[in-house]
Amino acid sequence: MKFGVIGAGQMGGGIAQVAAQSGFDVVVHDQKQEFLDRGKGVIEKSLGKLHEKGKLTDAPETVLGRIHFTTDLQDFADCDLVVEAIVENQQIKNDLFKQLGQIVKPEGILASNTSSIPITALATASGRPAQFIGMHFMNPVPLMQLVEVIRGYQTSDETARIVTETAEKLGKTPLSCNDFPGFVSNRILMPMLNEAIQCVMEGVAEPEAIDGIMKLGMNHPMGPLTLADFIGLDTCLAIMEVLHQGLGDDKYRPSPLLRKMVQAGLLGRKSGEGFYKY
């Protein structure tokens, strides 16, 4: 199988790395060469760490050699499976999938790593809804076991079978869910993070205390505000907006503080500052 990944960022790079580690030939696309170079550097560093710990079957250079980096979408023409991992914006994704639907070979499967946008809507844009599915990986991809597999309204049984088997070949545990905003993971997780942010806004406690209470009292490995910073506050806001709009319930209304921090460019780890400084 030839594996394609759109987006060389944190998620796309991780998906590409895991696919290459699993023996797949991988094509990775991004809009600019500098984005590809940055993504390649992150993959190299990650592979180096795994090699030092004895957790890599092949040499790092062998794994990296399986990945082709490109700025040309035409390079996906002969891919069997293409996973999109770009910005969480439905219109941008729709435009991309419309192009991919015309480029990728007719039997090729298109998948989205979206964390909240309805799969059925993206599938319609692709022009091949039977061969479209959600593959929601968790961050960081090389370490996290779960892949949420989300069928759209017209996703075929064969597409679901192939994608489930592929996720297993990547060393992941695929779990199926239906096409609702936020699926399972973010429908449960994001309101918790949003409520932690609301606690900061209302002065219930300082960020360190909120995180400490959830770690020590609820046995969470990472506090909710640290996790929000790690995910990216802009991503958290985008997901909350999809939940709020898609489900029509004000319990999913984004915290005003979350919106204000995103407007201020305080996006968390990726920008150097969020609820903590990095």
Curated annotation (Swiss-Prot):
Residues of the site described as Important for catalytic activity: H136
Catalysed reaction, written as an equation: (3S)-3-hydroxybutanoyl-CoA + NADP(+) = acetoacetyl-CoA + NADPH + H(+)
GO molecular function: 3-hydroxybutyryl-CoA dehydrogenase activity; NAD+ binding
Pfam families documented for this protein: 3HCDH, 3HCDH_N
Top-rank taxon, per record: Bacteria
Stored PROSITE patterns: 3HCDH
Gene3D superfamilies named among the record's database cross-references: N-(1-d-carboxylethyl)-l-norvaline Dehydrogenase, domain 2, NAD(P)-binding Rossmann-like Domain
Pathway membership, UniProt: Lipid metabolism; butanoate metabolism
EC number of this enzyme: 1.1.1.157
Any one Gene Ontology BP term: butyrate metabolic process
Keyword tags: Fatty acid metabolism, Lipid metabolism, NADP, Oxidoreductase
Similarity field: Belongs to the 3-hydroxyacyl-CoA dehydrogenase family.
The protein's name: Probable 3-hydroxybutyryl-CoA dehydrogenase
Lineage: Bacteria, Thermotogati, Deinococcota, Deinococci, Deinococcales
